[in-house]
Amino acid sequence: MDVLLANPRGFCAGVDRAIEIVKRAIETLGAPIYVRHEVVHNRFVVDDLKQRGAIFVEELDEVPDNNTVIFSAHGVSQAVRQEAERRGLKVFDATCPLVTKVHFEVARHCRAGRDVVLIGHAGHPEVEGTMGQWNREAGTGQIYLVEDVEQVATLQIKQPENFAYTTQTTLSVDDTRGIIDALRERFPAMQGPKNDDICYATQNRQDAVRDLAKRCDLVLVVGSPNSSNSNRLSELARREGVESYLIDGAHEIDPAWVVGKQHIGVTAGASAPQVLVDGVLARLAELGANGVGELDGEPESMVFALPKELRLRLVD
């Protein structure tokens, strides 16, 4: 039994930036530092930051006055930003710049009076933040959430000749393409972004899993259950006809999964650290794996800048 690693896997530039913002804020300003929502969707990362002095909350009313709050990588609504400003909270924004790009698109369409369809998963914090960029006082349009092709068939848009779509950044590329095609068939005048809203890291990791699935008879995806992009990786492997499981770490591996398997693929969602992958490899070795290889993959070199104040404090 051998193991094959997907490439790329694990942390993306947006996750790296978000985690680093929390760490540096704690180092420079001291604990506690409040973080609205899990800064990234990974249990191990969140627990580590808690130990360093981060306090995770779901709403700003849980943050005491005169404190610092960090917005998670998933982004927040304009209402949340306005509340933080009204209360005079010090804010560091860890929103992924690629999510911010989608926010700007929605705000631009709103000002232009267009209707907007957001393709995404209801209840996901990124979707809530993006929907919350819509300012009903700034335009005459409306924003709609679509989760699947079935909803497209019954969608009623007020301005079918004047609307655009955007997407959550961590969706299945294949599923999203199907929804966009269905929308365009019903509404030929629909506008879209100049570049796909699904982020480069999501695309690259899904391409890598598709390649992995061709070579393996089991694919393990390291990631937490609430991680959208990690769930999509496991779903994609199964769609390719391969047994696949989403695991938070080595402790969740069932030895029965590897019985009779010859080639085990391992990857990690964009919010899962390499240390968890290392633990999975060690556990697979205990279960009889005798070699680890790695696929060639799309190189990733993107780096997102930290907030200016945290960069300056590092120099000081």
UniProtKB/Swiss-Prot annotation:
Dimethylallyl diphosphate binds at residues 41, 74, 124, 227-229, 271. The keyword Transmembrane helix does not apply. GO terms for molecular function: 4 iron, 4 sulfur cluster binding; 4-hydroxy-3-methylbut-2-enyl diphosphate reductase activity; metal ion binding. (2E)-4-hydroxy-3-methylbut-2-enyl diphosphate binds at residues 41, 74, 124, 169, 227-229, 271. Its cofactor is [4Fe-4S] cluster. The active site is at residue 126. [4Fe-4S] cluster binds at residues 12, 96, 199. Keywords: 4Fe-4S, Iron, Iron-sulfur, Isoprene biosynthesis, Metal-binding, Oxidoreductase. It comes from the Bacteria. Isopentenyl diphosphate binds at residues 41, 74, 124, 227-229, 271. It catalyses: isopentenyl diphosphate + 2 oxidized [2Fe-2S]-[ferredoxin] + H2O = (2E)-4-hydroxy-3-methylbut-2-enyl diphosphate + 2 reduced [2Fe-2S]-[ferredoxin] + 2 H(+); dimethylallyl diphosphate + 2 oxidized [2Fe-2S]-[ferredoxin] + H2O = (2E)-4-hydroxy-3-methylbut-2-enyl diphosphate + 2 reduced [2Fe-2S]-[ferredoxin] + 2 H(+). GO terms for biological process: dimethylallyl diphosphate biosynthetic process; isopentenyl diphosphate biosynthetic process, methylerythritol 4-phosphate pathway; terpenoid biosynthetic process. Its EC number is 1.17.7.4. Pfam families: LYTB. Belongs to the IspH family. Catalyzes the conversion of 1-hydroxy-2-methyl-2-(E)-butenyl 4-diphosphate (HMBPP) into a mixture of isopentenyl diphosphate (IPP) and dimethylallyl diphosphate (DMAPP). Acts in the terminal step of the DOXP/MEP pathway for isoprenoid precursor biosynthesis. This is 4-hydroxy-3-methylbut-2-enyl diphosphate reductase. It comes from Stenotrophomonas maltophilia (strain R551-3). The gene is ispH.
